[in-house]
Swiss-Prot record:
InterPro entries: NAD(P)-bd_dom_sf, Sc_DH/Rdtase_CS, SDR_fam. The keyword Glycosyltransferase does not apply. This is (+)-cis,trans-nepetalactol synthase NEPS2. It comes from Nepeta racemosa (Catmint). Belongs to the short-chain dehydrogenases/reductases (SDR) family. NAD(+) binds at residues 16-22, 41-43, 65-66, 92, 163-167, 196-200. It catalyses: (S)-8-oxocitronellyl enol = cis-trans-nepetalactol. The gene is NEPS2. Signal peptide: none annotated.
Amino acid sequence: MGNKKTLEGKVAIVTGGASGIGETAARVFANLGARAVVIADIQSELGREVAESIGAKRCSYVQCDIGDEEQVKSMVEWTATTYGALDVMFCNAGIMSKAESAQTVLELDMSKFDEVMRVNTRGTSACVKQAARKMVELGTKGGAIVCTSSPLASRGGYIDTDYVMSKHAVMGLVRSASMQLGAHGIRVNSVSPMAVLTPLTRRMGLATPADVENAFGRFTSLKGVALTAEHVAEAAAFLASDEAAFITGHDLMVDGGLLCLPFFAPTS
């Protein structure tokens, strides 16, 4: 994104900021001039390490399970009290099912379904709600909320029904919140990345960038470019910045043209 400080002076929260896309976003936000970045995550050791590497004056870690709204409320309140502002909320934390099955409709493990919904749907909703309430209370000018969604929110899936459903719910939240919060000058958007190497994809057995490319590259029309966490973080930073001042209710696809291609059935 170059050296332009598009987030100069802003106070931002990044949920799931201890690893993966969230960690990269925390670093990108800081590099783009954010006055403070708060990492909210359940991974305390990793969260503290990331915050320390960015710098104590620029970044803090707060332990927060976003599925617990009281923890989200406390984290948002701590941020506003500590830094005197809240300009950006990047609702990035999310999980995939840990079920032994593929979570097809016929095999749906409802206890694992509930775990996914607790984080991806309830947790994201709590983050949007509490951030928006604080922005309204503070009279934040140009407040921005960005959620991590998925290209699957525009399609169905052969597996991982609970994850697909959760991302459809996130898109409903983004569209509704953008309509309701526009009167307060708060923009709400989402970023939908194709699969990228993160701890989440490693748990799927994809341990290297080459593994991810081999698994998903055939589904993109854009060739010769491998998606990185930096690409996703920079897309989120754009939506969070004043350069996107008239953009709200939008889902920014970072999918290499996935949705431009005909639909492919699985080969096995």
